[in-house]
Amino acid sequence: MSATQKPAPPLGLAFIAAVLKKAGHSVQVIDCVAEAPDVYYSFKDGVVINGLSDKDIVDRIESDVDVIGFSIMFSGNWIHNRTLIDTVGNKFQNAVIIAGGEHISACPEFCFKQTTFLNVCVIGEGEETILELISAIQEEKDLSNISGIAFRSKKNEICFGTKRTRIRNLNELPRADWSYFPIDKYKEKNMAFGINTQDSISFPILATRGCPYTCTFCSSPQMWGTRYFMRTPQDVADEMEDLVTVYNSNNFDFYDLTAIIKKDWIIELCKEIINRDMNITWQIPAGTRSEAIDSEVADWLYRSGCKVITYAPESGSKEILRTIKKKIRLENMLNSIKQSSSRGLNVKINFMIGFPGEKHIDIIESIWFLIKASWNGANDMAPAAFSPYPGSELFNQLSNEKLIDMDDDQYFMDIINIDTFFENNFYNNNMSNYWLRFYLIFYLFIFYSSNFIFRPLRFFKTMYNIATKRYESRGEMTLGELINRSKVKIIDIPH
């Protein structure tokens, strides 16, 4: 459980449910968080799980099930998911156990090694793969002819199919099907990662897939590849309009890796939203191509209801940006931040600290960038400790240097703790963990103190928004969530 984020409807599962339903399969979805949103229990080493217990999950699975799938996007979830996989697999030994998601795609052999009952790993996009896989299971065919999977053979050998070709025409895919999910619970408990959704529900949207960039800390190439494909603005707006009609949604959170690459595309989407008079709000990440956000784009974003835009410089040091292959120009980003803020958008920036090779001088340059970003109008900032994700270039480098041991659960605990300040370990040999933890806190201090100095009234507005739960920024929502989590009662459940 993240201490700083609210649960959100699981978009990946909704895509898989949609293609299975269209193919005529009987589908059951267990949304483990939304079905028990008020339950928090201790798992291990201070990790707290929000949602159904393993026993409750097993009890909800239909007895005649043929295939059971797990969505595992984040490596930080693995230490619980591996236990759950074997608990479920032990109970339903005649069912085929499948897992997919970014973590699975990055390290399938490791996932097989750490579980007993996992049968198949889906690597990369799952919509086409899952249909072929289910068909082969039903007809008892050899799985070796299926692209995009790894599987455990009857001899307990790990076998790989060929790499699956990326899905190019995203418009042809069925839209995420939310009919299998307890959306009323998300609305009742305000469980969605959107801004100002107290009276409605925020839905995740994916308008594009892939990222053409190759940042060394990112694992997305294992899941999506580096080819970039877009839905048409009309198709995206159609989906948003349908969700407004069916679920009375008034907010949308775009999950794209790099949402804005083509200026014409984002302007066309804004026009579609305005012309349909949907009366919604939405949030979007700028991605690496921040120069695409000029005054014209920022104006269209604001007019269409976009409230929050997120930039991800990761560092204010040109040397660090070069080593992590983050292809941005800091001055262009500062100008884009200024344009977005001046048009009324809430601007959030993401920062990381503790990259291998990072030095004190790089930290000082980052601090100076934070001050300039604050001056240019950024009003929200999320710092995180660098953590090497499986499948990323930096992960492979550190693994080769014997600095990562995935068999040691401490590696996964460090991933869980990336947004905390006192428990994370770093992979930096130039500064001690104590220095880096200090800098992590100082990033927050220098950014928000300069922000309130430049705009004194904002402090009081922030306090009011948190008190009334009318959040206008990610930072306000995070602080409000931390306050709510401090009141949570944690129970002990036997494992």
Residue ranges of model-derived segments:
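Glycine-rich beta-alpha loop elements in corrinoid/cobalamin-binding modules
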Residues: 19-20, 28-169, 391
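Catalytic cores of alpha/beta
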Residues: 110-114, 297, 357-372
